[in-house]
UniProtKB/Swiss-Prot annotation:
Residues 556-624 bind DNA. Keywords: Activator, Coiled coil, Differentiation, DNA-binding, Nucleus, Phosphoprotein, Transcription, Transcription regulation. This is Transcription factor SOX-5. GO terms for molecular function: cis-regulatory region sequence-specific DNA binding; DNA-binding transcription factor activity; DNA-binding transcription factor activity, RNA polymerase II-specific; RNA polymerase II cis-regulatory region sequence-specific DNA binding; transcription cis-regulatory region binding. Residues 102-111 have a biased composition (Polar residues). It comes from the Eukaryota.
Length: 763
């Protein structure tokens, strides 16, 4: 039994917070469980304090100091617990102590009351403090707490690694690790060395798991890179295959284009072989070389003489024309003689199916016209001056006619339009000598000439050189000859104009006297589908009233605007690159290009427009723009607008194209003209076979009802009046002026005053 002096000492030891050794002292003193008052004080302070019930008076102090960290660890581990949980824990421990005390008292032998009480106190202390199972449980709790803290620290330090570790660590592996750790806890003595060893093992495992995770991530990255490289290779292969396909498509397109060109060349060769040409000369200013042409069998008008002493600045150019062009004959030949004449030509040339000839039974002189067409570059035998711009500008169907009796008749149907001027010895009412016929052998030689492509190319080049020479030598008489015949000198408003016109007239008269003066008639192109040779007359004439300005008032050209200034050079470039392109297509190209240009690019042309307008205003202060009146056309007795007439002719041309494409063979007989007017004979040539398209020319195929473009001005009784001939506008403004305004109103025609006496073109 405990003595009274011992009680204060025991309470004093119980109140101390220093943990004691679990092993009891030799004197048998027992450390009691902390009192309820102590627990309440700790709860009020909210400081968790959990003391192991250890014996106080153990003499070995190192043992007591050894377990100080353990008690501290338990305090820290129990830190998060609430005071209520601590209180319940203490009560449970007290109950366990009391339950363990009862069997111990019953098992003791009967002794003295003091000894029994003392033994019971020792048993209580041993049951509460000294059992190894209790120590093992406390150490297991400490180790679990350490593991939890380590895992929390790892989670805080590496939060992103947690999902990968949880994926790698399966539930079975976790259970195995926990079981292994709990099984080894029994052998732990609770020393810091053992705890450090466990910590090292845990860190080793963590390092292994981290390295495994890094390896898996590296393998995953490698797989990603490999997949990306494979995708890139596939993309490159697809691009390569696409490029190869595009290249193959381009090669196929080139092959198709080459095949198309070959087909076109074959068609041209076939046309040249099937339709051998007759050669007609384009007469130079003198006829020195015409004798050589006559010796070769070319058909020449009889009114020309060979002058041996004259110089020949221009070599004669023999130009073939198309089968669709007309052949001229003399009035001395009747219809039967004309049929025999053409039959002889066809027999000599061995014309293939599809060949057509047009005839004119009345005229001053005759000439034969050949089938295939080459560019005509010079169409006069007299030296009427031709302006530089008129020579440089190719003639096309969209050009308005401009006339002058001093100029040669040139058809406004692109640069390969031949024309023929014929001399009348005694006037339009007198008969003249029939045209000479060439021998069949000469026709055969001309066939060989045209079939030779090199010879044709050479002829074209020589013709272009002749153009340049004409432009250089005849630049001085630019565009003013047309005024000579349309305006009387007495009607001039100023003395300056009168003097200029007199000088021009004198120059023209001198050259005409040197070369021989020619009068001109007008040809009516008539075609009939009859095969019996009957004269199918189909006339259509265009009349223009001279409204808006007086017939004797001179025409003043409008100043060019910015577009005209720019299009002047551009049109020439396009025509040099594509000489057979139709003017309407060129106008469309120029219009689209002009719209695509920026204002900065257009600025210099607007400045030029302002300069030209100012210059025009200074030169003509009283100028007032007066547009031409609208034209009408008489077709088979019906009065039609020009647009309606063009639509009719377009439909007829389309029908004729379809007719010839089918390959039907028909001979068009010679048609007689309904009316022969004194004046010029103009031959409208056919386009070159080098451009077998619908845009080459209006007259790309024979068409019925080709209209007579006729003016009623100046025909007085029986006096032979010199008619004005159709010719292209000069390039310096008239043709561009008409292009722009005809697009605005296709029925309104703009041009020179002399054109009031000529109706527009059939296109």
């Amino acid at each position: 039994m405990l003595t009274d002096p011992d009680l204060p000492q025991e309470f004093e030891r119980m109140s101390s917070k220093r943990p004691a050794s679990p092993y009891g002292e030799t004197d048998g003193e027992v450390a009691m469980v902390t009192s309820r008052q102590k627990v309440e004080e700790e709860e009020s302070e909210r400081l968790p304090a959990f003391h192991l019930p250890l014996h106080v008076s153990f003499p070995n102090k190192p043992h007591s100091e050894e377990f100080q960290p353990v008690s501290l660890l338990t305090q820290e581990a129990c830190g998060p617990r609430t005071p209520a949980a601590q209180h319940s824990t203490m009560e449970v421990d007290g109950n366990k102590v009391m339950s363990s005390l009862a069997p111990y008292n019953s098992s003791t032998s009967p002794q003295k009351a003091e000894e029994g009480g003392r033994q019971s106190g020792e048993s209580v202390s041993s049951a509460a403090l000294g059992t190894p199972e209790r120590r093992k449980g406390s150490l297991a709790d400490v180790v679990d707490t350490l593991k939890q803290r380590k895992m929390e620290e790892l989670i805080k330090n590496e939060p992103e690694d947690t999902p990968s570790i949880e994926k790698l660590l399966s539930k079975d592996w976790k259970d195995k690790l926990l079981a292994m750790g709990s099984g080894n806890f029994g052998e732990i003595k609770g020393t810091p060395e053992s705890l450090a060893e466990k910590e090292r093992q845990l860190m080793g495992m963590i390092n292994q798991l981290t390295s495994l995770r890094e390896q898996l991530l590296a393998a995953h990255d490698e797989q990603k890179k490999l997949a990306a490289s494979q995708i890139e290779k596939q993309r490159q292969q697809m691009e390569l295959a696409k490029q190869q396909q595009e290249q193959i498509a381009r090669q196929q397109q080139q092959l198709l284009q080459q095949q198309h060109k070959i087909n076109l060349l074959q068609q041209q060769i076939q046309v040249q072989g099937q339709l051998p040409p007759l050669m007609i000369p384009v007469f130079p200013p003198d006829q020195r070389t015409l004798a050589a042409a006559a010796q070769q069998g070319f058909l020449l008008p009889p009114g020309f003489s060979y002058k041996a002493g004259c110089s020949d600045p221009y070599p004669v150019q023999l130009i073939p024309t198309t089968m669709a062009a007309a052949a001229a004959a003399t009035p001395g030949l009747g219809p039967l003689q004309l049929q025999q004449f053409y039959a002889a030509q066809l027999a000599a040339m061995q014309v293939s199916p599809g060949g057509k000839l047009l005839g004119l039974p009345q005229g001053n002189l005759g000439a034969a016209v050949s089938p295939t067409s080459i560019h005509t570059d010079k169409s006069t035998n007299s030296p009427p001056p031709k302006s530089k711009d008129e020579v440089a500008q190719p003639l096309n169907l969209s050009a308005k006619p401009k006339t002058s009796d001093g100029k040669s008749p040139a058809s406004p149907t692109s640069p390969h339009m031949p024309a023929l001027r014929i001399n009348s010895g005694a006037g339009p009412l007198k008969a003249s000598v029939p045209a000479a016929l060439a021998s069949p052998s000469a026709r055969v030689s001309t066939i060989g000439y045209l079939n030779d492509h090199d010879a044709v190319t050479k002829a074209i080049q020589e013709a272009r050189q002749m153009k340049e020479q004409l432009r250089r030598e005849q630049q001085a008489l630019d565009g003013k000859v047309a005024v000579v015949n349309s305006i009387g000198i007495s009607n001039c408003r100023t003395e300056k104009e009168k003097t200029t016109l007199e000088s021009l007239t004198q120059q023209l008269a001198v050259k005409q006297n040197e070369e021989g003066k020619f009068s001109h008639g007008m040809m009516d192109f008539n075609m009939s589908g009859d095969s019996d040779g009957s004269a199918g007359v189909s006339e259509s004439r265009i009349y223009r009233e001279s409204r808006g300005r007086g017939s004797n008032e001179p025409h003043i050209k409008r100043p060019m605007n910015a577009f005209m200034v720019w299009a002047k050079d551009e049109r020439r470039k396009i025509l040099q690159a594509f000489p057979d392109m139709h003017n309407s297509n060129i106008s469309k190209i120029l219009g689209s290009r002009w719209k695509a240009m920026t204002n900065l690019e257009k600025q210099p042309y607007y400045e030029e427009q302002a300069r030209l307008s100012k210059q025009h205003l200074e030169k003509y202060p009283d100028y007032k723009y007066k547009p031409r009146p609208k034209r009408t056309c008489l077709v088979d007795g019906k009065k039609l607008r020009i647009g309606e007439y063009k639509a009719i002719m377009r439909n007829r041309r389309q029908e004729m194209r379809q007719y010839f494409n089918v390959g039907q063979q028909a001979q068009i007989p010679i048609a007689t003209a309904g009316v022969v007017y004194p004046g010029a004979i103009a031959m409208a040539g056919m386009p070159s076979p080098h451009l077998p398209s619908e845009h080459s020319s209006v007259s790309s195929s024979p068409e019925p009802g080709m209209p007579v473009i006729q003016s009623t001005y100046g025909v007085k009784g029986e006096e032979p009046h010199i008619k004005e001939e159709i010719q292209a506008e000069d390039i310096n403004g008239e043709i561009y002026e008409e292009y722009e305004e005809e697009e605005e109103d296709p029925d309104v025609d703009y041009g020179s005053d002399s054109e009031n006496h000529i109706a527009g073109q059939a296109n």
